[in-house]
Amino acid sequence: MTQCSGMLTTEPPKKGTGAGIWATDMADRFPTAQVIGTDLSPVPPGMQPHNVTFEIDDCCSEWVFPNDHFDFVHVRGLFGSVADWPKLYREAYRHLRPGAYIEQVEWSVHNRSGNGTLSPNHTLAKFSQNAIRAGTMTGKTFEIAENMAGLIREAGFEDVVEKRFKWPVGPWSTDPKLKEIGRWNLLNWEEGMEGWVMAAYTRVLGVGLYFY
C-alpha cells in the first residue's frame, strides 16, 4: 500500500489469498462489494467483515464459479506455484464480466543493485539463480513477473498496463517512501524466506538447509 499511496488496488476475488489480509481490507474499504478469497489452505478465523468469504480452492484447476461472474480478479505472489499460467488467465477471462479487470502483483526473482555491484556470487544473486533453476525443474516458473503482461494479453485481455517499481531490501534509501518500503520489504524477506526456499531447495534442488 505504501507503493501505491495507500490504495489497495490500482483499479476499481483474490486468488492465492494467503492469510486473507488483502481480501479483508478490500471488504472493509468497499462494504457493498462481495469479496471472495481462495487458497489451497484455510484462512484462520478472525474478525472478517460480513461481505468477505474464504474458500479452499485451487486456482490452477477449473474454476467452479459461473462464467461472467466477477467484476475484478486480483492475483498476488504466485511465482513458482503455477504450472500453466495461460490456463489460469483463460479461466480468469472466462469468469470476468465484459469490461471487468484482472490485476496481478508479482515480485521479480532477479535481485539487482542500483549501481551494478551485485556479483554473481552474492547470496541474493545465488538465490535468484537457484529459484530460476528450481522453476525450470518443476515447470513452475519463478519469472512470471517478467512475462505476465504478455500472457495476459494472449488470454484476450485488452488495454493491459504494466507498472514496475523498485523495492529496496532494507531501510537504506535516503528517499522517505523507499526507506519505508525497504523496511517492510526486509521484514517480508525475513519472514517469507523459509516458505520460498525450503521445499524448492530440499525437494527439488536436493541441497541441505545450510547450503550457503
Regions found by a protein language model. Name each.
Residues 4-67, 72, 87:
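Class I SAM-dependent methyltransferase SAM/SAH-binding core
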Residues 17-20, 40-43, 59-61, 75, ...:
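Conserved beta-strand elements of beta-rich interaction domains across eukaryotes
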Residues 32, 51, 99, 157-159:
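A generic structural signal for alpha->beta connector loops
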Residues 69-77, 103:
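Short SAM/SAH-binding signature in class I
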Residues 80, 101-198:
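Conserved catalytic/acceptor-binding region of the Class I
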Residues 82-84:
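Short N-terminal helix/helix-N-cap motif within the alpha/beta-hydrolase-1
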Residues 86-101:
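A short glycine-rich, Lys/Arg-flanked "PGG" loop and its adjoining helix->strand segment in the class I
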Residues 193-212:
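C-terminal transmembrane module of eukaryotic multi-pass membrane proteins
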